[in-house]
């Protein structure tokens, strides 16, 4: 989709910020500033030291893309790729450096250090920056469509954002914004899955994305195929700026700036006018979507931070019954219901950097309201064929404590959740004259605990990660037993040379079936015997890092599924549905479906080097 961008800068003195990169360099474990670190432009003589507070400023660049590196004796160096310098505002780059195992007289940043690699997830992770997202062909400024182009990722149909990872199902993915879970990231979301036709997240807010297709950290649960960690920018600290955007299908406004000396914000609203376009070209359905997003970050001091963010949407689709001339139009009008759906996620994360480690406290709430209805011949005076109303509410608390040392690091924590699900369902459109007519009002209480340890050996050539997690839900006897959901995770990474690694991972992961399945109560029975779905992952691979800011990796994977709900009315596994609109899982099911997926991935990723960048991948599943 081609878009026309109109920029409304809400300041008058923006020229003074032209061609500047500024930011801070801090210790990853303590958040203390690192004075005297050298920040430089890769391939350029431009450099600057950090001051006593860890701040730096680089000047003298013309607008364009730059790689920014930082080095300091006693710490591992880092590089931030593709930092965009413009005349509109200063580019902001912040670095967190980890203490090095070996203290050398001179710091040399290896190509491997330039790429993000975590010891607990040495395989099956792709990290992409904002410029890679914005320039993605066909991505349309939509993070899910960009992710669909990564290794191991497939999509269902072209007009939807479903993520099918390494042969899994579209309902096996989890999403986090700055560490806060966001269950819905798409408009017109499929209840019981995660896909939809249009993304909700404003990509102008994104700093970078880490996408895991295996090797999940122990603090991440309830996922079988992928974890998407979306890291957001902070608002501007100097003045307020904004972008007013008119596209082919929507209009939006984005603002960011300071609320006070210690508080910044990002905020956006968006509304589509697809209904006018669809009506003009004669389509029999008229969708409209609206969304908002904001983030507020407050720094009490260097050791205490609070982040509050929210994302929400309101989506409506009505029928255009005047467009009924062709057989195709009449067919769509005959089966397509009308939709009314809204959802929001809101969360707060408090971070404390202390002498004993880093503590995160996360509170969040999610609510989905989903309604759809259908009348015979689309006439409200005739019989009602479908009347569906449902709500999902999740209230979550998570506490995690992390200790980082040069030779090892650890994390422990736990989570508590309350989930509410209610529905009033009437549907007489089903095959064989079956009528679905039931009500559910359920509350589920959940808890989880997790621990992870990472050790570095043989002068940092060998990294070992050991993790364990368990989840419980008060649904039935099986889900209440924590031993039934023990989730061990093991990862190994060994440097054969400075820039060549051998990596492997094993993990057992659990995910609760959707509330639509847990809460089903029909004349044919209920789903009280369902339990957690299990998936075991085996991954092995090797990565070669090249001096021209590139890496080549090859990975083999094997996934084994068990206890997947088998939908009795449709005679199909729940894993194979979810790539369409509406609701999935609201029928009688048994936890008897098993499966497997295996394949091979070959990836070449080129970060910015002499104007060249890109990614190429081959996936065999």
Locations of regions flagged by a protein language model:
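Periplasm-facing N-terminal accessory domains of Gram-negative outer-membrane beta-barrel systems
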Residues: 16-106
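Periplasmic N-terminal accessory/gating domains of Gram-negative outer-membrane beta-barrel systems
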Residues: 76, 83-87, 91-92, 108-217, ...
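Hydrophobic, lipid-facing positions within transmembrane beta-strands of outer-membrane proteins
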Residues: 161, 224-226, 240, 246-253, ...
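Predominantly transmembrane beta-strands of Gram-negative outer membrane beta-barrel pores used
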Residues: 174, 208-219, 225-233, 240-284, ...
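Surface-exposed extracellular loop regions of Gram-negative outer-membrane beta-barrel proteins
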Residues: 185-186, 192, 322-325, 369, ...
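Outer-membrane beta-barrel translocator domains and adjoining extracellular loop/strand segments
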Residues: 278-283, 313, 318-327, 363, ...
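Face-selective signature of the C-terminal outer-membrane beta-barrel domain
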Residues: 297-315, 336-479, 488, 546, ...
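Gram-negative outer-membrane beta-barrel transporters
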Residues: 457-458, 584-621
